[in-house]
């Protein structure tokens, strides 16, 4: 390949994958690749995958099939990363003969070398886990991209082994980055114009617990909050059992810490929570919610719900609905249970019929839709501080997020990107808010 080389990245799954895709783009920029939004003109296509549910995994294979003919028509390299890559490894190269390279969740640092080999016709898979401190030194950072928000990885992996979850098998055990590296990365990002950071990890609340002498997650938040020029701090994802009183106190004491937390309950029944190996009861979860709201009364809480878990009775399911009503989530991600390889739940009996699971999922989503619309309507007439991120998808409005992580669209000058502005909310929609500048600028 000579001259300009174009890279297209398709990202499936969570915010960690979005962050990893940013790092992929940064690494390959050093190999002469610039990004394109059009896969049909790309010289290299990277598909960053998710395997949390079977549906997401099947979607990846379907997506890869689109490029078989394209590769016959012209010179094109195709790579797969992320959790499906980690899970399948060499099998992906055999199953998808038109695939050139496969890299796992711990192997991003090898990507430049693998691409160079692929350019010479060599197919490779690299999916070795690095479950020790050495992997911390291999975290590639995304380039300064000119945006006002930034994802910052603070830890990787998970040690909880919830019975339904494949994450420990495809992301590895928990390892925390050194706080000095995290703080240095954020200082550099702020110097480049970033005003908001989202701290990422499969279980951010356990940050530092396995590293002698390291800060706790609450301590890390306090250090980051002291960085001049940084306006807002967010984090995801939190495991309810690991939320400490020290962390809850941060919501009362740190104005830069945004008033939103993603707190996955997964179910409202103690028997199902126990079968899921979640490590808390319904009451313990509700006590954490109450403590968070005592610390920050206006905090908005989002969550995850799984329906159709093996053995879930109608009574168990009704407990989930009642939990949702008691918490009053702003929004949730809701899913039908999906058996995953290697997980403990995959061998459980008492499977729920698909029809019943689908019906329960519809009831969950209907209840949440009503609560979300009601919650959004409650913001109409209020004035919200919005960090302007840029132009909306429609292109004729600005968009940004409130402290509580709600998307707001409004008319304004594009030069406001990166600014905190007051927006009066005029209308609530299921997925966003509409507003107008309180003082037109």
Curated annotation (Swiss-Prot):
It catalyses: N(6)-dimethylallyladenosine(37) in tRNA + (sulfur carrier)-SH + AH2 + 2 S-adenosyl-L-methionine = 2-methylsulfanyl-N(6)-dimethylallyladenosine(37) in tRNA + (sulfur carrier)-H + 5'-deoxyadenosine + L-methionine + A + S-adenosyl-L-homocysteine + 2 H(+). Residues 5-120 form the MTTase N-terminal domain. Binds 2 [4Fe-4S] clusters. One cluster is coordinated with 3 cysteines and an exchangeable S-adenosyl-L-methionine. Its EC number is 2.8.4.3. SMART domains: Elp3. Residues 377-439 form the TRAM domain. [4Fe-4S] cluster 1 binds at residues 14, 50, 83. One of its GO terms (molecular function) is N6-isopentenyladenosine methylthiotransferase activity. GO terms for cellular component: cytosol. The keyword tRNA processing applies. The keyword Transferase applies. It is found in: Cytoplasm. It holds the Pfam family Radical_SAM. This is tRNA-2-methylthio-N(6)-dimethylallyladenosine synthase. The lineage of its organism: Bacteria, Pseudomonadati, Thermodesulfobacteriota, Desulfuromonadia, Geobacterales. The gene is miaB.
């Amino acid at each position: 390949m000579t001259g300009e080389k174009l890279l297209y990245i398709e990202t499936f799954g969570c915010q960690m994958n979005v962050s990893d895709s940013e790092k992929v783009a940064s690494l390959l920029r050093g190999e002469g690749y610039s990004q394109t939004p059009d896969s049909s003109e790309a010289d290299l296509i990277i598909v960053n995958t998710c395997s949390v549910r079977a549906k997401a995994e099947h979607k990846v294979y379907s997506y890869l099939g689109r490029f078989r003919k394209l590769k016959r028509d012209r010179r094109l390299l195709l790579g797969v990363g992320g959790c499906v890559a980690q899970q399948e490894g060499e099998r992906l190269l055999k199953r998808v003969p038109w695939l050139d390279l496969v890299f796992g969740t711990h192997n991003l640092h090898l990507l430049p070398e693998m691409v160079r080999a692929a350019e010479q016709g060599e197919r490779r898979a690299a999916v070795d886990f690095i479950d020790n401190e050495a992997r911390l030194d291999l975290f590639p950072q995304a380039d300064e991209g000119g945006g006002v928000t930034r994802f910052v990885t603070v830890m990787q992996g998970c040690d909880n082994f919830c019975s339904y979850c494949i994450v420990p098998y495809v992301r590895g055990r928990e390892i925390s980055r050194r706080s000095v590296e995290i703080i240095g990365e954020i200082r550099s990002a702020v110097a480049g114009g970033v005003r908001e950071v989202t701290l990422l990890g499969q279980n951010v609340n356990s940050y530092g617990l396995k590293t002698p002498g390291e800060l706790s997650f609450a301590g890390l938040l306090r250090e980051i909050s002291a960085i001049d020029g940084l306006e807002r701090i967010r984090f995801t994802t939190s495991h309810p059992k690991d939320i400490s009183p020290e962390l809850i106190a941060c919501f009362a004491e740190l104005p830069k810490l945004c008033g939103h937390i993603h707190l996955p309950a997964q179910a409202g029944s103690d028997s199902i929570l126990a079968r899921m190996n979640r490590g808390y009861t319904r009451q313990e979860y509700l006590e954490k919610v109450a403590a968070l709201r005592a610390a920050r009364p206006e905090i908005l809480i989002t969550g995850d719900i799984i329906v159709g878990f093996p053995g879930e009775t109608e009574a168990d399911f009704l407990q989930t609905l009642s939990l949702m009503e008691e918490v009053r989530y702003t929004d949730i991600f809701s899913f039908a249970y999906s058996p995953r390889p290697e997980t403990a739940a995959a061998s459980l009996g008492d499977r729920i019929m698909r029809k019943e699971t689908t019906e329960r999922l519809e009831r969950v989503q209907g209840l949440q839709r009503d609560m979300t619309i009601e919650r959004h309507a409650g913001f109409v007439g209020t004035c919200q501080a919005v960090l302007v991120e840029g132009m909306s998808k429609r292109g004729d409005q600005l968009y940004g997020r409130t402290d509580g992580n709600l998307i707001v669209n409004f008319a304004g000058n594009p030069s406001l990107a990166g600014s905190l502005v007051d927006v009066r909310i005029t209308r609530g929609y299921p997925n966003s808010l509409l507003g107008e500048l309180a003082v037109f600028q």
